[in-house]
Amino acid sequence: MSQPSPQRPITIAILAMGGEGGGVLAEWIVDLAEHGGYVAQMTSVPGVAQRTGATNYYVELFPKGGSQANTRAPVLGLTPVPGDVDIVIASELMEAGRAVQRGLVTPDRTTFIVSTNRVYAMTEKIALADGRVDSGALLDGCKLAAKRLVHGDMAQLAESTGSVISAVLFGALAGAQALPMQRTAFE
């Protein structure tokens, strides 16, 4: 289980397409943190349309004891900063690739939780030949970029259990032990 630095917040970026419950997932993380003794903040930047950009959610957590030791309330960020994100959660493999491309995932810091399912981009669908991006190459890039990669087809797992992908991603976050909360706190 990771322990936070008393000088900096825990930073989490979530990339999810419309209807996948990214906002709900972010709210669950905020609720988890607040019940665990953290000051928590969530922001979001909506994508333009389903395959031209996911909605990006950003969550920062700061231990209440840390803010009291500093005698001031923490000032939390509004957007993820490349190279400074502790946990990145992507609901789809291409979104994971975009997180890597944006520099949100780094080998010295980031636990990367990725659903390997694909929703093909318009450019992949309209190509005269097979225009699909190689999923294996995307996953290899994710492995190289992250300190730790947790991956699997979480959309399929959600469907097979009658759940939703946001719940599976929350479970993956609990299982990854990337936050300083006990697994039972996630329940």
Question: Where are the predicted features?
Answer:
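Active-site cofactor/cluster-binding pocket
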Residues: 1-187
